[in-house]
């Protein structure tokens, strides 16, 4: 019997006498070596979903089409991947319009869900949280830091109920003056962290987005965790639920390009003890914890044609190592244990 996908990967490791290792799902353009970050339109079209070992080896492509696929996240049981795609976008719609899709971890059965972006799974793997326009299934906000956008809410949805009965999502944030995006579900399932800023706050390519948490059922008032004159992005809960990792904008835009300088920061779940983990004056974005909470993977802008690559650091900011290399741009990683299934 031929094994596919993650099952084959686990089998190969066991055969080699090794314990199963961690797996990273990520976005890459390595299949098109002619791309650079300056070619924004083609870059947005060419990005595909890949899977690799946690050490950066054995990368393989899961999606293959002439459109953009991005922001992947593995389900807690490792069997499914939720991701963005603009394959359903019409010519009349903005180029960054995206829908949510779900597929098997091996890349099979790619199925459209609803319009939205940047989904995260609930700990039990039944629900997803994502952001979309306040009208429900309208234009999602841009995922480029500093880009102008319309209002956006955080929505939740039962994936299997939607597939079986078309039971739609409902929004748990409802502020028409704000853009709420980048949700991440807490390990205990009770709260969702997200980023929020005012719709009008798009001047000088410099948002003052902050990190908030809200009850996962939408009750109560969202609680603000950060309060800075800078931009905070992409919150990610630590596996024990004690801390939240995020990208924190510090300083002027990076010389030679439109990407602002983002570092990595961490804060306690109650908003106390904000700590800066990196200080590199470059764009470091979309950080996520390893499943054991000991390491962090993120993508960084580097010089040359492979303008974004994945890096790993220890949870205290030490021990940096580069995980991916040109050709191709690599980023938007999500880490998961292969032997969790």
Model-flagged regions — what are they?
Residues 3-21:
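Bacterial Sec-dependent signal peptides at the C-terminal "C-region" and cleavage site
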Residues 16-341:
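Sequence signature of WD/YWTD-type beta-propeller architectures
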């Amino acid at each position: 019997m031929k094994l596919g996908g993650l099952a084959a990967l686990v089998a190969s490791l066991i055969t080699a006498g090794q314990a199963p290792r961690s797996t990273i799902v990520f976005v890459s353009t390595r299949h098109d070596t002619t791309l650079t970050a300056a070619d924004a339109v083609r870059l947005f079209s060419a990005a595909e979903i890949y899977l690799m070992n946690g050490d950066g080896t054995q990368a393989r492509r899961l999606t293959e089409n002439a459109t953009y696929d991005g922001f992947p996240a593995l389900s807690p049981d490792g069997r499914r991947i939720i991701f963005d795609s603009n394959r359903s976008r019409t010519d009349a719609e903005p180029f960054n319009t995206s829908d949510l899709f779900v597929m098997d971890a091996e890349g099979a059965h790619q199925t459209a869900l609803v319009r939205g972006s940047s989904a995260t799974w609930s700990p039990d793997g039944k629900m997803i949280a994502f952001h979309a326009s306040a009208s429900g299934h309208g234009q999602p906000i841009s995922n480029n830091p500093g880009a102008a956008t319309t209002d956006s809410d955080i929505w939740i949805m039962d994936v299997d109920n939607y597939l079986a009965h078309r039971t739609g999502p409902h929004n748990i944030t409802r502020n028409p003056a704000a853009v709420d995006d980048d949700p991440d579900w807490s390990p205990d399932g009770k709260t969702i962290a997200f980023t929020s800023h005012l719709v009008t706050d798009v001047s000088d390519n410099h948002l003052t987005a902050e990190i908030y948490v809200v009850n996962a059922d939408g009750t109560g008032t969202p609680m603000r965790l950060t309060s800075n004159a800078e931009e905070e992005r992409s919150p990610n809960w630590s596996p024990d639920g004690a801390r939240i990792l995020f990208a924190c904008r510090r300083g002027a835009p990076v010389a030679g390009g439109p990407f602002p300088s983002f570092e990595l920061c961490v804060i306690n779940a109650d908003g106390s003890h904000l700590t800066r983990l990196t200080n590199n004056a470059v764009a470091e974005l979309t950080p996520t914890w390893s499943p054991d909470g000991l390491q962090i993977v993120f993508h960084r802008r580097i010089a040359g044609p492979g303008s974004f690559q994945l890096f790993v650091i220890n949870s205290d900011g030490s021990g940096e190592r580069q995980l991916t290399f040109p050709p191709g741009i690599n980023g938007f990683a999500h880490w998961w244990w292969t032997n969790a299934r």
